[in-house]
Swiss-Prot record:
SMART domains in UniProt: RING
EC number: 2.3.2.27
Function: E3 ubiquitin-protein ligase involved in the degradation of non-functional 18S rRNAs in response to stalled ribosomes. Catalyzes monoubiquitination of RPS3/uS3 in response to stalled ribosomes, initiating a HEL2-dependent response that activates the degradation of non-functional 18S rRNAs.
Lineage of the organism: Eukaryota, Fungi, Dikarya, Ascomycota, Saccharomycotina
Pathway annotation: Protein modification; protein ubiquitination
Compositional bias ranges of the Low complexity kind: 637-649
Protein name: E3 ubiquitin-protein ligase MAG2
Native species: Saccharomyces cerevisiae (strain ATCC 204508 / S288c)
């Protein structure tokens, strides 16, 4: 609060000066009006910069709004009067607005503190709290959004085979740092990605470009050999395009940024179990990750992760499923290159027999692989020491370490995981971990494996820095990795005590209830979407066919169709013949219009109902024709019996009358 003495001093000391200023301004305005009448065209005098700044500040703080428009107009040509407004008047106007509650903080003025002028402290605490909370929210949103592209995308979603002749200190400390291009020997990917150029289900000698898409080596060389030109619309000049774009995503790619690919099946990766699904049985393994290590291993292996290192050798079959980066020797890399050459030659024989392929890009592919082999051999002076080092390293691994006696909760992280070879990592939900911790009291006392039923799976979770700070056992995963949380059905777990289940029964029921409500909501939204899509298609077909049926009628037809589908009456398949009424002993027979199936221009079959009046006329016309034909036949028989015989002993036969049919509902006889 401002002291009363200061308020009196401020009001008493500045009252006279303010009145003098107003009088001087009014007199100057009158004089300015009279001078403007005498001299309508007059030159403006150069204004003072200091007075201009004070005048703008005076108008900003509200003093100028209390004056008339006439005074404001007169102040512009004569700025000498503004020099009488001193700093004391500006401070007084600010003080009055603050006391009246009309002062608003706007623009850069908010960064200037005026507390020393008023001798009291403004309440800045609430504003700082709101500012800090908003900044935390913005930072949280920024952390949750992870953009992956290029090497970061490859580092997150795929495993790598790297050259064992190099050390990787940056990757040892931070899993988010991508490995250099020249140190990557193979990128291990799961099967299922087709080559978008030749559309083969399994690319031959697969290669990965910068964006992460996979192509055949020969297809990729053919793509890079095509020269594209760009034409300038203004000048009409065409020039060669300097770069290539990915056929799938449009990212800039080049022949020097291509990585060899190795499929998991070729790498003898066996799936421990299938992808988890709600209601299915899942096998969970207890993983152990010591502090400072980036390699979690199952406790059942009895292998110390610190002895294996963060990047174990690739030919160690028992742990190659769990390592994100593995070291590979030159001999194994040469073996993989030889497999690529054999695959290219086999595919060429097939293409030559079927398509009469010239083999131009096949030769270029083999030459490209030979160049890579030469580069690899040139960098290696002697291959035997490398293989000996790998074999000696394998002898150091012992599968008799008891991890539970060596590590506990204070020295390692213990957690459950399944399907470790997948790009999406599956872990237990926090509530399930809490229940297990209540049962066994320590993470290291958890069972080595659990086989139970999955109740629900939560997807759409991405590893961020905030998530790693919350769950430290996922610190070995790169930022951007997709994870899924599994909810277990604790009603089917035998080792759960009854009292502990009752302790968490409310939370489990609430979680199950939320899952049921979410599923019902999704099913409802799906039905609404399908109904809306069906209505849009029906509206489109009606517009194309020129039918003037209203949208409300289409909704009624759709409702009627749904009622027919949901009824208990068995619906037989529609044939080309007319459909009769449904046979049902419980229901009364109803008269229905006959229907036919008609094939539309889109290749679909639809039921077509004929007009009853037209059908009745057609039926009468057909009956009349049959009756007329019978009469003609009977008349022929009587004529043949009554006619006299001819000279050669045969009776004469009368010629039949003709019946002419026209394409109308009316009969015409001739």
């Amino acid at each position: 609060m401002v002291e009363p003495d200061m308020q009196k001093k401020a009001s008493g000391g500045s009252g006279g000066s303010e009145m003098d200023t107003l009088n001087a301004t009014s007199n100057s305005s009158k004089q300015g009006v009279s001078n403007n009448k005498r001299n309508p065209v007059s030159k403006k005098k150069p204004g003072n910069k200091v007075s201009d700044g004070r005048d703008n500040a005076h108008n900003y703080h509200g003093e100028g709004r209390r004056k008339s428009s006439k005074q404001q107009r007169s102040r512009t040509p004569y700025k000498e009067t503004s020099t009488r407004i001193n700093d004391q008047d500006i401070d007084l106007s600010i003080q009055e607005e603050i006391l009246g509650g009309n002062f608003k903080l706007r623009g850069r003025k908010t960064q200037v503190s005026i507390n020393h002028l008023l001798n009291f402290q403004l309440p800045e605490v609430e504003r700082e709290k709101s500012r800090s909370s908003s900044s935390k929210k913005s930072n949280r949103r920024r952390d949750e959004h992870v953009h992956l592209h290029g090497d970061t995308f490859v580092n997150v979603n795929y495993r790598l085979l790297v050259d064992d002749r190099f050390d990787y200190p940056e990757q040892n400390c931070n899993p988010n740092v991508p490995v250099d291009q020249e140190k990557i020997l193979r990128v291990i990917v799961p099967k299922g990605q087709n080559c978008s150029i030749c559309l083969s289900e399994e690319p031959v000698a697969p290669r990965m470009v910068t964006c992460g898409h996979i192509f055949c080596l020969s297809c990729l060389l053919n793509f890079f050999s095509i020269e594209e030109t760009v034409k300038n619309k203004e000048t009409g000049y065409s020039k060669k395009k300097k770069y290539k774009e990915c056929p799938l995503c449009g990212s800039i790619i080049g022949p020097k940024r291509v990585k060899p690919v190795l499929y998991e099946d070729d790498f003898d990766v066996t799936r421990l179990n299938q992808k988890p699904e709600p209601g299915a049985t899942v096998h969970l393994q207890l993983m152990c990750k010591p502090h400072g290590s980036l390699l979690p291993l199952p406790v059942a292996l009895h292998l110390d992760p610190l002895k294996c290192g963060n990047f174990p050798p690739a030919n160690l079959g028992s742990i190659k499923h769990y390592a994100h980066i593995m070291k590979c020797g030159v001999s194994y890399s040469l073996e993989l290159y030889q497999k690529d050459i054999v695959a290219i030659q086999e595919q060429y024989e097939i293409d030559k027999a079927i398509y009469n392929d010239s083999g131009k890009f096949v030769k270029q592919s083999i030459e490209n692989i030979n160049d890579q082999i030469s580069t690899l051999l040139a960098a290696t002076t002697d291959l035997s020491p490398l293989s000996n080092d790998i074999n000696n390293g394998l002898d150091n691994f012992h599968f008799d370490d008891d991890l539970l006696t060596k590590y506990d909760d204070s020295s390692a992280y213990f957690f459950y995981q399944t399907l470790v070879a997948s790009s999406t990592k599956y872990f237990l939900s926090p509530l399930d971990v809490k229940i297990l911790l209540t049962i066994f009291h320590y993470y290291s006392k958890f069972p080595e494996s659990i086989e139970t039923t999955v109740e629900n799976i939560h997807y759409d979770t991405v590893v961020t820095e905030q998530l790693i700070r919350r769950y430290k056992y996922i610190g070995h995963l790169p930022i951007g990795t997709e994870i899924a949380l599994l909810d277990l059905d604790w009603r089917k777990i035998p080792f759960l005590p009854k009292e502990i289940y009752e302790q968490f029964a409310h939370e489990l029921k609430q979680r199950r209830r939320k899952f049921t409500m979410k599923k019902q909501k999704e099913d409802k939204e799906k039905k609404l979407y399908e109904k809306r899509l069906e209505q849009e298609h029906a509206e489109f077909y009606r517009k194309e066919n020129g039918n003037s049926l209203k949208f409300e009628d289409s909704v009624q037809m759709a409702t009627h169709y749904e009622s027919i589908v949901s009824s208990s009456i068995p619906l037989n398949s529609l044939g080309i013949s007319m459909l009769g009424p449904p046979t049902n002993s419980c229901s009364t027979p109803q008269k229905q219009a006959p229907s036919h199936t008609k094939r539309t221009i889109w290749g679909t079959s639809i039921a077509v109902t004929e007009d009853e009046k037209a059908s009745k006329e057609n039926k009468e016309f057909q009956d009349m024709l049959l009756q007329r034909i019978r009469q003609e036949d009977s008349s022929d028989v009587t004529d043949s019996t009554d006619s006299p015989p001819t000279s050669n002993g045969k009776r004469g036969r009368k010629k039949k009358g003709k019946v002419m049919l026209f394409s109308s509902n009316h009969q015409a006889l001739g």
